[in-house]
Amino acid sequence: MKFTLVGNGRMGHEVASVIDASTVHSIAAVLDIDAVITPEVFRGSDAIIDFTVRDAFLENLDAMLASGVPVVTGTTGWDGLREEVAVKVSEAGASLLYSANFSLGVNVFLRTLREASRLIAPFAQFDIAMEEHHHTGKVDFPSGTALAAANVILSANSRKQRIVRELPEAGRLAPDDLQVASVRLGSVFGKHSAFIDSEADEIVLSHTAKSRSGFASGAVEAAVWLAGRHPKQPGMYSMDDFLNELLG
């Protein structure tokens, strides 16, 4: 397969390294911040992999969708516009797969967290909270992966109703608040932990990224999967869709 990479930052370089090491894939083009993005620049590629920033992704979206080439993006920060993006994807008859984290390990963590959240839901003695650690260069907080994990908890445990990113200046958290704490420290690639606590027990579920290679490999695998579905099955997809098909 031939890939066009949008974004030439750390993740873009990591994805390029994964593709370069492959015997079956190649890079058609790498588009950096100075590139003029039109539908034509993507034609001849089998898939687009985008790792940019929120504003660049939204600015380039129409051209990527109009190209007819399936798009995989790991750019975060636009969750509040998900419905609008889904409408654009549908109107263009395009295929787009979005994930805040393409690491297969993280997605195993999220599935484990979903089951744990469901299991503790009937038992009021168990409380749950999230914490994420990333390097000091990461701009958004909580991370997209932490928000995905928090939404997994909310969907599986009705005792939690809302995400709280900061502690209140006075008073304390309500019982149905889900705290998502963020730490920015050194060069940490990414660590996400869920803490389940009661008077008698503590359960900790955690995933630590050792390098960016897991994110990059997962993005390439997801792009291969998406290209295999397009154009017969266009639409907006997630890593859950990818994994569900693999796992049956």
Swiss-Prot record:
Q: Name one Pfam family in it.
A: DapB_C
Q: InterPro entries given for it?
A: DapB_C, DapB_N, DHDPR_bac, NAD(P)-bd_dom_sf
Q: What is its EC number?
A: 1.17.1.8
- GO CC annotations, alphabetized: cytosol
Q: Which superkingdom, per the lineage?
A: Bacteria
Q: Which UniProt keywords apply?
A: Amino-acid biosynthesis, Cytoplasm, Diaminopimelate biosynthesis, Lysine biosynthesis, NAD, NADP, Oxidoreductase
> Which catalytic reaction applies to this protein?
(S)-2,3,4,5-tetrahydrodipicolinate + NAD(+) + H2O = (2S,4S)-4-hydroxy-2,3,4,5-tetrahydrodipicolinate + NADH + H(+); (S)-2,3,4,5-tetrahydrodipicolinate + NADP(+) + H2O = (2S,4S)-4-hydroxy-2,3,4,5-tetrahydrodipicolinate + NADPH + H(+)
Enumerate the residues binding NAD(+): 32, 74-76, 99-102
Per UniProt, subcellular location reads as:
Cytoplasm
Active site, renumbered: 134, 138
Query: Which pathway does this chain act in?
Result: Amino-acid biosynthesis; L-lysine biosynthesis via DAP pathway; (S)-tetrahydrodipicolinate from L-aspartate: step 4/4
Q: Note whether NAD occurs among the keywords.
A: yes
Is Oxidoreductase among this UniProt entry's keywords? yes
Q: Which GO terms describe its biological process?
A: diaminopimelate biosynthetic process; lysine biosynthetic process via diaminopimelate
The residue stretches assigned to a coiled coil in this entry are none
* Residue ranges of the TM segments: none
The Swiss-Prot or TrEMBL record annotates one GO molecular function as: 4-hydroxy-tetrahydrodipicolinate reductase
Role summary: Catalyzes the conversion of 4-hydroxy-tetrahydrodipicolinate (HTPA) to tetrahydrodipicolinate.
Similarity remark: Belongs to the DapB family.
Q: What is this protein called?
A: 4-hydroxy-tetrahydrodipicolinate reductase
- Which species is this UniProt entry from? Chlorobium phaeovibrioides (strain DSM 265 / 1930)
Its organism's taxonomic lineage begins at: Bacteria, Pseudomonadati, Chlorobiota, Chlorobiia, Chlorobiales
